[in-house]
Amino acid sequence: MKQQHEIVVIGAGLTGLSTAFHLHRQGRDVVILEKADRVGGQIHTYHENGFTFESGPNTGVVSFPEVAELFQMLEGSCQLEIARESSKRRLIWKGNRFHELPCDPVGAITTPLFRLSDKFRILGEPWRKKGTDPDEPVGALAARRLGKSFYEYAVDPFVSGVYAGDPMKLTTRYALPKLYNLEANYGSFIRGAIAKAKEPKTDRDRLATKKVFSAVGGLQRLVEALSKDLRIITGANNLKVMPTADGQWSCTYNGTEEIVCRKVVTTVGAYALPALLPFIPEVQMQKMSNLFYAPIIQVILGVKNARGLDFPAFGGLVPSKEQKRVLGILFPSSCFEQRCPDGGALYSYFIGGARHTDYLQKSDDEIREITLEAFHSMLKYPADMQPDLLRIFRHEHAIPQYWSDSGERFATIEALQQQYPGLILAGNMRDGIGMGNRIHQGATIASSI
């Protein structure tokens, strides 16, 4: 069967839903094609035995005004939930326990996380010379400007927490452009941060509060609210997009189905593009689709009686130097309401990542053993105590890694969009990996079509 629509969005993850939602609000004729039998992409909320937990992203950051504006538009069907004030605390593992990551000068001086020499070294950061390598990795930049221990016990675990990546491979100007620009534009992290804080802000700018967020009841509520009024075709298998002779686009799926449209927006992972866009020359496709995605195993662990153990923080991160088998542990029940029964606790463990891709092949029993060992040794629960909930989720293509080849990928995307009018290549292969980035990108694309 053949249909005609103005715009087709490929993929019903957060980027695709955000894009289509804004287009629909403009009165545009838009339809989403999704391979899976459900919408939401990596976002999936579960409710089991009094626990509410996520199998994909746990939180986002209100990093753009578009995030706050989206929830305002969805008011009545989805409510923004800002994390508790205690979520500002981040814990870092060193030795045999967690230490709070300092957030002020006094804390930076007194913390046992950093060497004394580096504590003095940071005082000279505003006068340190700029780097000369435009593709300098995050880790090298941090060690050069702040010192080795700041790299090892602040930047390394931060990169593990955000990217599940290797800070010596992630290129700063692509992976952390705001950090890169502080040195590039102001010559210093400290001077740049002070200057940015003094810049005048509009009322709209202030909507980007940088606070951690979820949705009341879980992120699935956001997916449901976005998709409520949209035309979405799920189970769209063997999907292919081809340009037509008359300057339109043909989207075929399930063998006999076809939608012809004027514009098509792809929001799928880079690894799915070769099969989706067979008309793109191999050389150009290789420059886009070679993006590496770090694999992640996420383990949800819940206890109905926390026995008084309390972790009022966002989570605990583990520096690679400490050689633990987990990347970090998030504390969702410390951040948000009604994530566990009264008196209980909910934890989200992250295992694997770019530096331990082999962990994806470990059995459920091996993953369970790793998690329980951390449950007892790191969170200090009694050895005889077992969790009331333990769920394992495996994500082969979890988080894209913005390495030094990213510039070539971005240039290829731009060239292809110029070469093929009406084709928009979106998703997390560009413009950032966080939920805030995905919402921002969706709104930006919708306003540009």
Which sequence ranges carry the predicted segments?
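Dinucleotide-binding Rossmann-like beta1-alpha1 core, especially the glycine-rich loop
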Residues: 49-129
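Conserved Rossmann-like nucleotide-cofactor binding loop
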Residues: 15, 38, 271
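Glycine-rich FAD pyrophosphate-binding loop
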Residues: 24-48
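N-terminal Rossmann-like FAD-binding beta1-loop-alpha1 element of flavoenzymes
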Residues: 5-32
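Mid-domain catalytic core of redox enzymes
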Residues: 26, 237-347, 354-361, 365, ...
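Short, well-ordered coil/turn residues at beta-beta hairpins
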Residues: 63, 144-145, 267-268
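Conserved flavin/dinucleotide-binding core of flavoenzymes
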Residues: 102-106, 311, 329-449
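Active-site/ligand-binding neighborhood in enzyme catalytic cores
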Residues: 124-241
